[in-house]
């Protein structure tokens, strides 16, 4: 019999972070680095726990090169060939430890991942990514990949509830991707009615993972630096970004000019555009669960990354956290009916403003 859970689940837009007494004098005092030891691979990692999503127009080799300079991680999209990887590895061998090779649960994907990892042993991360991480087929794929690569750090998802986080960790994953439907170009919730508000999903999944010494990624739903900070405050060990990193020089695809404005294309990996590009079209038995949009051209991604980290550092000063590690212990969320005063409209994106000015003067 169908049942209703009456407890209200929350999204980033439903809360604000309550400020607390702080001894910090400047944002520059905040350490945004983290160091982790992973549950099953037993590897240690240190860096800034922000990850570029494994999407065509985000998780590119060009993005990986730039984000490596900031000690971010890039989950490279799965549509590069082994030859593409060989060319990239020859040019940028120092970037390989900061990237994940991505794939799904199919035999072809696992075979491709295996070929790439055998050719490039410096790659330390594997990202096993499917829309529905609740499938037993996916759990078995995680077990198989763990058996084949005992020392690689496995990212697996997506799920939104604690029991499945535990299942995947016990099956060999190290980091669980949390999020079904929150992405800016994802239409899963509309097409299927399935999903879970992202803030509550992160809170519940982080609690389950940390009980087993596992880790979680908040994947999707961030629209601004404040959302990234809320995800960390909710217990996310990493935050994965798609839309916030789209539209840059490193994002793949050509610039489009419409009415004098430069734009770039951004689309979900379950959109009809992605399926036409990689699978020859949308299969008769399924529906598109993503959309294709154009976003303002934003120039180099480094500027946006600095803005994101600046916002997170500022959050830490408001709650008295001298290290990013401390933010979840210092965070108290308050439910709100309104977050912003938008009497003069949306605040401009500084990166977009700078690019727009250059276009006008150029």
From Swiss-Prot:
SMART domains: IMPDH. GO terms for biological process: purine nucleobase metabolic process; purine nucleotide metabolic process. Pfam families: IMPDH (PF00478). One of its GO terms (cellular component) is GMP reductase complex. Keywords: Metal-binding, NADP, Oxidoreductase, Potassium, Purine metabolism. The active site is at residues 186, 188. It catalyses: IMP + NH4(+) + NADP(+) = GMP + NADPH + 2 H(+). Its EC number is 1.7.1.7. K(+) binds at residues 181, 183, 186, 189. Coiled coil: none annotated. NADP(+) binds at residues 26-27, 78, 129-131, 180-181, 269, 285-286, 314-317. GMP binds at residues 219-221, 242-243, 268-270, 286-290. It is an enzyme of class 1 (oxidoreductase). One of its GO terms (molecular function) is metal ion binding. Disulfide bonds: none annotated. InterPro entries: Aldolase_TIM, GMP_reductase, GMPR, IMP_DH/GMP_Rdtase_CS, IMP_DH_GMPRt. Belongs to the IMPDH/GMPR family. Catalyzes the irreversible NADPH-dependent deamination of GMP to IMP. It functions in the conversion of nucleobase, nucleoside and nucleotide derivatives of G to A nucleotides, and in maintaining the intracellular balance of A and G nucleotides. This is GMP reductase. It comes from Phytophthora infestans.
